[in-house]
Amino acid sequence: MTAIQQFFKTFFLTELLKGLALTGRYTFKRKFTVQFPEEKTPISPRFRGLHALRRYENGEERCIACKLCEAVCPALAITIESETRADNTRRTTRYDIDLTKCIFCGFCEESCPVDSIVETQILEYHGEKRGDLYFTKDMLLAVGDRYEKEIAAAKAADARYR
C-alpha cells in the first residue's frame, strides 16, 4: 500500500465508518431476550449443574469408594472416606463436595465407573453463607433421590454420544 493510499484511509477514517456501518446494521435487527425467572430456555442434556449421588433401584447407593473422582478433581473439591463392610465391599462413610472450590468440569462424572456421581441440570441454587455450598453425602443422596427421573432422562438422551 502506498503512502498516499494510507494517508487517505487515515484521513477519511474508513475503519471508523466500517465499524459504524456494522453497528447500524445490527441496531435495527430483532432482539432475542428471555425474561429469565418467568421464561426459560431449553437446557442441554450435557449441562453441568448441581452434583448428586445416585442409588440403584434396590435403594443401595452406587458409590463403591474407588476415589477416582477425588483423584481426578483438578480443584480438590471432593473429599471421600471409606470403610470395608462385613461382606468385604467398600462403601463411603464420608463424601463431601465443596461447591465454592468446584469448577464444574465434569471430570468426576466421567471418571465414575458406576455412574454414582452426576451433575444435574439444576442451575438455581444458592447459599447465604459459605457453609451452605458444602454438600455432604446425605445432601447429595437427597438431591439424587429427588431428581432421579430427570437424571435418568438426561443420561438416556446423551447415551448415544458417549
Swiss-Prot record:
[4Fe-4S] cluster 1 binds at C63, C66, C69, C112. [4Fe-4S] cluster 2 binds at C73, C102, C105, C108. GO terms for biological process: aerobic respiration. Binds 2 [4Fe-4S] clusters per subunit. The keyword Cell membrane applies. It catalyses: a quinone + NADH + 5 H(+)(in) = a quinol + NAD(+) + 4 H(+)(out). It is found in: Cell inner membrane. Its cofactor is [4Fe-4S] cluster. GO terms for cellular component: plasma membrane. Its main location: membrane. It comes from the Bacteria. GO terms for molecular function: 4 iron, 4 sulfur cluster binding; iron ion binding; NADH:ubiquinone reductase (non-electrogenic) activity; quinone binding. It is a peripheral membrane protein. It is an enzyme of class 7 (translocase). Its EC number is 7.1.1.-. The keyword Secreted does not apply. It holds the Pfam family Fer4_7. Keywords: 4Fe-4S, Cell inner membrane, Cell membrane, Iron, Iron-sulfur, Membrane, Metal-binding, NAD, Quinone, Repeat, Translocase, Ubiquinone. Residues 54-83, 93-122 form the 4Fe-4S ferredoxin-type domain. InterPro entries: 4Fe4S_Fe-S-bd (IPR017896), 4Fe4S_Fe_S_CS (IPR017900), NADH_quinone_OxRdtase_chainI (IPR010226). Belongs to the complex I 23 kDa subunit family. NDH-1 is composed of 14 different subunits. Subunits NuoA, H, J, K, L, M, N constitute the membrane sector of the complex. NDH-1 shuttles electrons from NADH, via FMN and iron-sulfur (Fe-S) centers, to quinones in the respiratory chain. The immediate electron acceptor for the enzyme in this species is believed to be ubiquinone. Couples the redox reaction to proton translocation (for every two electrons transferred, four hydrogen ions are translocated across the cytoplasmic membrane), and thus conserves the redox energy in a proton gradient. This is NADH-quinone oxidoreductase subunit I. It comes from Burkholderia mallei (strain ATCC 23344).
